[in-house]
Amino acid sequence: MADRQEVVLSERERQCLRWVEEGKSSWAIGVILKVSENTVNFHVKNAMRKLETTSRTQCVVKARRLRLIE
């Protein structure tokens, strides 16, 4: 299981997860961050891989628990 010492999320991955936590879609996050929906999905999927999760919700919960997002 990934723990705090092993996991480093990029600033963009953290930004995307914060917006996912607010319930925003990838499209809406892309509009907010001025990037494409595919770019948002890329960052979210990278965070999911790093945190060894299988859903966006699990990823946000684990990132919050590990204090990777505030």
Language model: regions and residue ranges:
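Recognition helix of helix-turn-helix DNA-binding domains
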Residues: 25-58
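Residue-level signal for pocket-adjacent positions within structured domains
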Residues: 2-4, 46, 63-64
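Short, basic, alpha-helical segments at the C-terminal edge of helix-turn-helix-like DNA-binding modules
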Residues: 56-66
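Regulatory hinge/linker segments at domain boundaries
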Residues: 1-15
